[in-house]
Amino acid sequence: FRVGAGDLKIGYAGRMIKANAAYYGKQWHLEQIFPIDGLGAKAARDVNHQLHQATAAMSRRKYVKQGEYIPNFAMIDQHGEFLQIRQLQGKPFVLNFIFTRCTIPTMCPASSIRMADMQDAAREAGLNGLQFVSITFDPAFDSPGILNQYADGYGMESKNFHLLTMNQTVVDDLLRQFGILTMEEDGTINHTMATLLVDTNGRVAYRKEGATWSTKDFMEAATKLLLK
């Protein structure tokens, strides 16, 4: 089987995976590779079951606003590792939603450029504790391997940048929790946008709606958190 560059980089040697097999170009290919093994997988199921129950009980107009705490959730990062968001507790992080097939320059591509620029700015400013989290809208396409390639394409350094994917149920729960609206139309995903700065205790310290947020505003807010 042939695999994509991102999956090849991850490796998955000795791990249990699920994947789709496809035959084209006179070769078999493995696509949509997701790990399904280990304690991380079981913990993720338990955490996300609680997330789903909490989301189902939410009122229609409820979502996480500035000053409120985000729920715990578990996803898989661009290295094929399970991550619970509470593992970042103690470190502030910037969170947004993107999908790799987005073709509107002012939406996901622009947001990812700003996230990568902010990572560079944080490193240059010595704000080494600041983390970055991007969650995909499109888990049907955005496997860990695809996100791995996406990170490389935008120059995102993996040590403190987490690109996350999971099944559609988890993604849908998070979209509702964070007040993001999506609609599939003409082969793409139309969506609203929000970018959040989450403090060391899991509380939203700053939230900006829309696609035109400023890295300067987020850097100023993050600096205040890290220099407290």
Residues of each region from the PLM?
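Structural microenvironment flanking redox-active thiols in thiol-disulfide oxidoreductases
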Residues: A110-L174
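N-terminal "domain-start" segment that seeds a small globular fold
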Residues: A13, P35-I85, I113, D117-D120
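Solvent-exposed coil/turn segments that connect beta secondary-structure elements
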Residues: A22-Y24, F99-T100, F137-D138, M156, ...
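Short, charged beta-turn/beta-strand-edge "cap" motif at the junction between a beta-strand
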Residues: N20-H29, F34
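Short nucleic-acid-contacting surface segments enriched for D/E, G, S/T with interspersed K/R
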Residues: R2-K18
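Short active-site neighborhood of thiol/selenol oxidoreductases, capturing the structured segment around
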Residues: P71, L83-R114
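Structural micro-motif
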Residues: P71, K159-F161, D172, R176-L196
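Thiol-/selenol-based redox modules, centered on thioredoxin-like
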Residues: D120, L181-K228
